Amino acid sequence: MENAENSTRCPWCGADPLYQAYHDHEWGRPVRDPRRLFELLILESFQAGLSWITILRKRDGFRAAFQGFDPASIATWGEPEVARLLQDPGIVRHRGKIEGAIRGAQAFLRIEARDGFSPFLWSFTGGEPLINHPRALADVPAQTAQSKAMSGALKREGFNFVGPTITYAFMQAAGMVNDHLATCDWRS
């Protein structure tokens, strides 16, 4: 899309430039890199109960606090790191979510060694993006059979804050599902 200023977008991103840039350049674009998928999944887990724009505004803080979302590093963290993060105003300071990110990093390492994290996650869509054709926001589901299956599998592996609504939002963010509205100039 050349002229983003005059484009038609999905209405959920509103007029906020940060939200529009996220919509235009990230949301719905397939991500296969395991570390980037880990970052997206952890950020989505922190979003539980909050708005996504809150997480976007703190994303740089999260990246700094979580050492670029390096799973090998995060997996070794204990109470000192949790205490440090609970004092960091650049992130969402929620003990359960921080501890969940540490357990998620440990689970990531197990999955990556066994199956590969990216193939594991993409297996819930058959390895290819699911292309939906919503005409309005009301046509976009909050969860699907695939997000329920992914949620259950991630929980069994040790992830937290990954219910089926969070995993569906993750699938949208990672381009596993294309839910750009039919009228959105950024659909393709």
Predicted feature locations:
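HhH-family (HhH-GPD) DNA N-glycosylase catalytic core used in base-excision repair
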Residues: 1-188
